[in-house]
Amino acid sequence: HVAYHTEHLKILLAHRPGFTAPTQAARKVATLDNLIDGRLWLHIITGGVDADQRRDGDFLSHDERYARTDEYLQVMKGVWSQEEPFNYEGDYYRCSKASSEVQSIQRPHVPLWFGGVSEAAIPVGAKHADTYALFGEPRSQVTELMALLQHQAAANDRKLSFNLSFRPILGDTEGAAWDKARSILAGVEASSPKSRGINASGKGPEAETARRLTRLIEGGEIQDECLWVPIAA
């Protein structure tokens, strides 16, 4: 619908490996890229919380999921780039004479976005991603993380682009914006006073990104000039 009513806007589509064969997913993505005139970006979401994955029947561990994503993207890229049918055999996927008659408009393939900053995630993202998606953290931490990711990418003869996600809170004046922020916090605390930062097992966050944000909250309400973090995690 969005693509039909726009001409230049890029479409960022979230896609979770593990529930569709990578060969089939590669053909679907290439087809969609053709239908919307080469405006598709694909954000690979591996999944950082066991309970969320298990609701959909995925019982692999956190690190196993990232290992599977690595294979998934190897196969997808093979479908997009190989001129001849190819075979693949890994721990999670096997295919024989995989190919696609449809190729994406964007070459060599639809740009890949990736998220995750755990020890299992970073090597996979640095190997495959075109754009690495990060959450808003203090400048020093973002700079350190970007340097680590670029170092990992360089080991694969690659260079990453980055997306940094913030949720701006706006007001007619700075004071009004701060009043609005604290009103939002009061609403969050009223609706979930005991559950914030706690997962289904009753423990702290499983995902490394969530753990980083939780530690950030413990460091103070405002960081840098106006990075406000009480509801970051």
Predicted regions and their residues:
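An alpha-helical appendage that flanks or caps ligand/catalytic pockets
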Residues: 48, 56, 62-106, 137-233
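Glycine-rich anion/phosphate-binding loops
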Residues: 17-34
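Short, acidic/polar
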Residues: 25-28, 114-124
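Conserved, mostly hydrophobic/aromatic
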Residues: 2, 32, 42, 76, ...
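Glycine-enriched alpha-helix->loop->beta-strand junction motifs that scaffold or abut catalytic
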Residues: 5-8, 36, 126-132
